[in-house]
Each structure stands twice: as C-alpha cells, then as structure tokens.
Curated annotation (Swiss-Prot):
Organism per entry: Agrobacterium fabrum (strain C58 / ATCC 33970) (Agrobacterium tumefaciens (strain C58))
The keyword Ribonucleoprotein is annotated on this UniProt entry: no
Predominant location: membrane
Effect of gene knockout: The deletion mutant is hypersensitive to ampicillin, in a manner only partly dependent on the beta-lactamase AmpC. Deletion of the yejABEF operon leads to the accumulation of anhydromuramyl tri-, tetra- and pentapeptides in large quantities in the extracellular milieu. The yejABEF mutant displays cell swelling and lysis as well as a severe growth defect.
Topological type in the membrane: Multi-pass membrane protein
Intracellular or extracellular location(s): Cell inner membrane
Residue ranges of domain ABC transmembrane type-1 in the record: 179-371
GO BP: microcin transport; peptide transport; protein transport; transmembrane transport
GO cellular component, one term: plasma membrane
Family: Belongs to the binding-protein-dependent transport system permease family.
The name this protein goes by in its record: Peptidoglycan transport system permease protein YejE
Keyword set, alphabetical order: Cell inner membrane, Cell membrane, Membrane, Peptide transport, Protein transport, Transmembrane, Transmembrane helix, Transport
Amino acid sequence: MSLAQPAGTETLVKPKRPWFSPTTKRRWQNFKANRRGYWSFWLFLILFFLSLIAEFIANDKPILASYKGEILVPVMVDYPEEKFGGFLAQTDYKSSFIQDEINANGWMIWPPIRYSYQTVNSNIPHSAPTAPFWLMDEKERCSAYPQGNADPGCTLGNLNWLGTDNQARDVTARMIYGFRISVLFGLTLTIASALVGVTAGAIQGYFGGWTDLLLQRFIEIWSSMPVLYILLIIAAILPPGFFVLLGIMLLFSWVGFVGIVRAEFLRARNFEYVRAARALGVGNWTIMFRHLLPNAMVATLTFLPFILSGSITTLTSLDFLGFGMPPGSPSLGEMIAQGKNNLQAPWLGLTAFFTMSIMLSLLIFVGEAVRDAFDPRKTFR
C-alpha cells in the first residue's frame, strides 16, 4: 500500500554541484584572456607530449615490422638477431643484411628520423661534426653511400636534418631526447621542492614562536651558502645520474617556496574560522593542510613556472660544465659545450640555444598568465 502524494506539493530536486567554483571559472577565463600565455601553455604541452613519444619520432629501430607473417614491434621489444637468421646478438636494424632479410619476408615502418640519441651515423660525407643535409648538394650528402645518389639508403629519414655532433650522432634526435630529460627533470624537481618547501613554510607560519624562529635562522644560513659551488663539489664526488642530480639540487631548491607559504600562514592563522576550528577540537594538521593550505597555494602556483624554468637552467649549466648527466646522455648543456668547442659547426650551439630559448620563453609566458589569472585585481574582458 502506497501513500498518494498530497495535491499541490512538488518534489524537491537537489541541485547539481558544479564541477568548478565561480572563482575557479573566473581564474580560467582570466588565464585564457592572456592569449600569449594561453597559447604558450598549449604549445608547451604539445612539445612535451612529442618528446614523451620520442622513441616513435627518432629511433634506429622500426616502429612496426612484419617478418614471415609475424607482427613485430622493435621500438618496444628487443628481438635478437638470431630471429632474422643472424647471430645471437642485439639486432642492428640499419645493417643491410637485416633490412634485406626483413624486406624480403615482410615490411618495416620507420620513424621520421632513423637515429636515436646515441646512434652513430657511419655514412657521413666527411669527418664529424657534419653540417645539416640541406646545406650540402645531393652529390655530397650521399657521397658516403656505396651507390652514391642512387643508393636506396640515401633517403630523407637517413639524412641528418640538423647535422651531427663531434661523435657523428644526430643532433635532431639528441635535441628531442634532451628536451624530454630537461622538462622531466625540471618538473620532478619543482614538485619535490614544492612539497618540501610548502610543508616547511606551513609549519613555520602556523606554529610561529620558537619553531618559526629556529627554522627561519636555519633557512637564512642555508640560503646564504654558495649553491653552485656546493653543487659542483657534490656532483664531482658522487657518480652522475638523474636521481643523484635531483637529490643534490633538492637540497637547496625548496627554500624558495618557504617564504611565500610562511607569510600566508602567518596572515591566516588568526582568522575567525581557524579559531572556530580550534575551539571545535580540530587537529592542527587538519587545519593546516585542509583549511589554510588552499589559500596559500594560490601564491605558490604562480611561482611554479618560474621555479621550473630555473631548474631547467641549472641542469643545463651543470651539463655544460661537465657535472650533469652521465656521458652519452642527451643533454642541451652538453650540446652547448660541443658548440663552444667546435666553432666551425655553429649548428650545434644554435640548435641548443634556440631549443632552450623557446622552452624557457614558453614557461615564462605561462607563468605570467598564471600570475595574472590568480590576481584578484585583474579582470580581463
């Protein structure tokens, strides 16, 4: 038995909660209104995504191959040469024997650039470093191939678009992989620095007193140290590596976040809603990270793109001085050092310079747009 709904009454429908608050929508609109920063953001994301799939753009292995009816993915799986009738060794897909064997029993799809960052080009027309292929005539660029201009290996994918370095490695491939390492290193360092710096600043600003005094004196002493010299000394002692450099630079990079977060917590810790939360028995850590931290993150977010660009610049500087990534790693700093040592090959320094300039300019434009978006005094139409 069911009760009939009384006449004249309406069922109340709970309104749907919007995905974003009006403040967030206003900030996003302000960010989009800054056209230079908005398009720089998307251009940077596209370049970063392309660098993440660098193995499918620049590689000395085919993306996809078919051999005797079997589909192979050499770019992701290492197949021994024995599979193609050779020896039990790593397969060199650029050798004529392997290419003839696969083409006779199937097909191969190569990436646009048939070189990885560590592939040595043995068909350069003269001693390395060699110029980009478009600075040579057709006869010169194919002179190292057995059949010259008629050789099937002298194709656009096998030519060096931006030349080679002093070890006959493709500059374009090293630029793409170097861009990826620089951005990944900068992002990882920025996120780790933000976690440490925000936590330290929150503790200082919320508790105040002796906690704030002691930590502030420590930070003043720590930040007054010659960072670059200490980085060089530690990097010279420890074996080079991605995570070794990350740990070394994290020792000092977190300090930049402390002052901003500390000031926000000092300002907000005596607000009425904080006092009410304390009176209700809410714990200090809950108040800090659930109620105060969102307000402090506004200033922190505007600071992140500039910290990211600074992290990339520091890594490039260490690589340039020879204290960065391990030898052979794709590095923009190492490419700049090669350009300095090979002034007769200006394409080395110019490639690294323009890559760094574009990357840092995009990050600065994005940082300016984020800063304007979170500024309540600015409203764009």
